Amino acid sequence: MSKKLLCPLIIIIIFSSLIEALAAPTKKKVVKYQTPVETSLVIDGQTGKVLHSRNAKQKIYPASLTKVMTIYLMFEALKTGKLSFDHQLYVSQNATKALPSKLYLVAGEKISVLDSIYALSIKSANDVAVTVAENMAGSEKKFARLMTIKARQLGMKDTNFTNASGWHDPKQYTTAVDLAKLTMAIKRDFPQYYKLFSEKSFVYKGKTINTHNKVAATYPGAEGLKTGYHVPAGCNLITTATRGGKSLVAIVTGHKNSTTRDTKMVRLLDTHFGVPQLSNMVAKSPQPTLKKSSKKSINKTKQQSVAMKNSNKKNKNLAKTKSHKTSKA
């Protein structure tokens, strides 16, 4: 074959291969995560005494429970006067790129500190978390360093933060024990602001945004606090509640869905508030069992009773008929 024919042929083969490669569907890389470990912890909200613990020192991914630390730093800035509720936070283009859950902020607009706190605690808005971080520290990365430093100051030895929202990062982790320390600290250090966690909705741009924290919204005596979820973390929840003068801080993490998570939380709270468990009461009540002979005897008695009733009805009808015939005559 001559060189003149060979060169175009090679070009055609290469070009055809390139077209096939581009046309072939690209396989999406499926990331598989290990099933999260379920952890739980209940402590006395006044003394810090541990009332229940299960895998509480196991390192976990906090997901949006991260935002409790973000809010802690906001409360601290409010207390020192660095921020005020009316202070306006600038929204950057970078902040608007945050993935849901979000408030769908627009680049260049501003949002107040108070609305930001509500958006974090009620909506769990990631774009707001980035906005807060950038306004308070210049960047989310710098803000995350401040979060980790504060964690150490609060005695959270097994916690590390890399972002303000809780978006998954393998290097962002904590434990139920550390989350309890953070919750106790935010109650203790900012009693004047802590009550904001009890809000179940807020209005932003004329739209009412409701909480999806069902336990906080419906459990008797619940005060707050925060939900969290992404696939590697599972469904997480921190709840604070007070009943009959007794205060509890409870953490539940790693559940497959919000229903099992909430059920677990309610059971823990009920148990340590001393609320009688209906299922336990039913289980403890002795259920009478019938032997076969007893069942036969009961069935026989029922049959006799029915037969007697039918017989009585016939007699009454017969008596009425006779009486009717006599009166006509």
Residue spans for each PLM region:
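Active-site-adjacent loops and short helices of periplasmic peptidoglycan-processing enzymes
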Residues: 21-177, 184-187
